[in-house]
Regions:
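ABC transporter nucleotide-binding domains
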Residues: 3-8, 13-207, 212-213
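Small/polar loops that bind or transfer phosphate-bearing groups
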Residues: 78, 188, 233, 286-290
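Active-site phosphate/pyrophosphate- and oxyanion-stabilizing loops and adjacent acidic/basic residues
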Residues: 97, 194, 218, 276, ...
Length: 315
């Protein structure tokens, strides 16, 4: 069996004078969670729409499960778009069964699977409510269920956590991890870099319509390592040592009097040398390399913070 469930190769797409995708290539491993990252307007949603046969590329190819992607393959993809699209006036259960039947399930099988999901997410009381009676977060739970109910091998979630409070966002994260562990492959587009570190095996970062960074999350973080270490220590307050290390962050003492520091050592200094100098001042409790976060890497690569992006979404 091919280890890649989906591969996009040299995909480009233009809308009038706007280039949405410029020679984009990604490989999605079977059974992995793949993060598609980038600002609004970077090209993420255009790529997702090409994968779902909503729009066609101007050039390039998309391969699904070892063969060129066709319209028939779309039935094996579950897609949760950022723009939610349920019918407000219909009853929740009636609509969910209808959508499941469109994906090839019989009415009996659809109802059985849906009721199991409704029980799992503790929303059985919503079955006979109209969608317009539910909050945005409740509606998103329903649409999540209708996306996964036919058990497609590939699931695509576009900004799945928007509109959720922290508790429900954590619930959805657990469900996504369970789906991966059950053998599903997940692609999700997000601005939430913390979610990337929690969930993703691999990522591709798109900026100005091109892939500027890709790989396994752990490898990407190691690629951007910068001689920074985390130290938790007892004893006196640690002082920096010229030409050996600087202290970039120092926390207040905890209940036991332990302090946590972030240190940046000089490149020529070995870890053994650093530790030797540290124990002269303090009693180390934990000491480990501190890899940059995905947010830090995003800022360094793209040159702007996610929270300050004002790029229009031309996708």
């Amino acid at each position: 069996m091919n280890d890649l469930i989906l591969s996009a190769s040299h995909v480009s797409k233009r809308f009038a004078t706007h280039t949405a995708l410029d020679d984009v290539s990604i490989d999605v491993q079977r059974g992995h969670i793949f993060g598609l990252l980038g600002h609004n307007g970077a090209g993420k949603t255009t790529l997702i729409r090409i994968i779902n046969h909503i729009t066609a590329p101007d050039s390039g190819t998309v391969t699904f499960d070892g063969h060129p992607l066709t319209q028939n393959d779309v039935a094996r993809i579950g897609y949760l778009p950022e723009e939610r699209g349920l019918y407000k006036k219909m009853k929740v259960g009636e609509q969910a069964v209808y959508l499941a039947q469109l994906k090839g399930l019989s009415a009996r099988e659809a109802k059985s699977r849906l009721q199991a999901w409704f029980e799992k997410l503790e929303i059985t009381d919503w079955w006979n409510k109209r969608l317009e009676e539910l909050s945005k977060g409740m509606q998103q739970k329903v649409q999540f269920i209708t996306t996964v109910v036919h058990r497609p091998p590939l699931l695509i979630f576009d900004e799945p956590f928007s509109g959720f409070d922290p508790l429900n966002a954590d619930l959805l994260k657990r469900e996504i991890l369970e789906l991966r562990d059950a053998g599903h492959t997940v692609i999700f587009s997000t601005h939430n870099m913390e979610s990337v570190e929690e969930l993703c095996d691999d990522i591709a970062l798109i900026s100005h319509s091109r892939v500027v960074l890709s790989g396994e999350v752990s490898d990407v973080r190691r690629r951007f390592r910068n001689n920074t270490y985390s130290l938790t220590a007892a004893g006196e307050v640690l002082q920096p040592v010229d030409r050996l290390f600087e202290i970039t962050e120092a926390g207040a003492p905890d209940a036991e009097g332990h302090r946590t520091y972030l240190l940046r050592k000089s490149p020529e200094v070995t870890n053994a040398e650093l530790l030797r100098h540290l124990v002269e001042q303090v009693e180390p409790i934990t000491f480990a390399e501190h890899l940059p976060t995905m947010r830090d890497i995003f800022v360094r690569t793209v040159g702007a913070d996610l929270s300050t992006s004002s790029a229009p979404d031309h996708e």
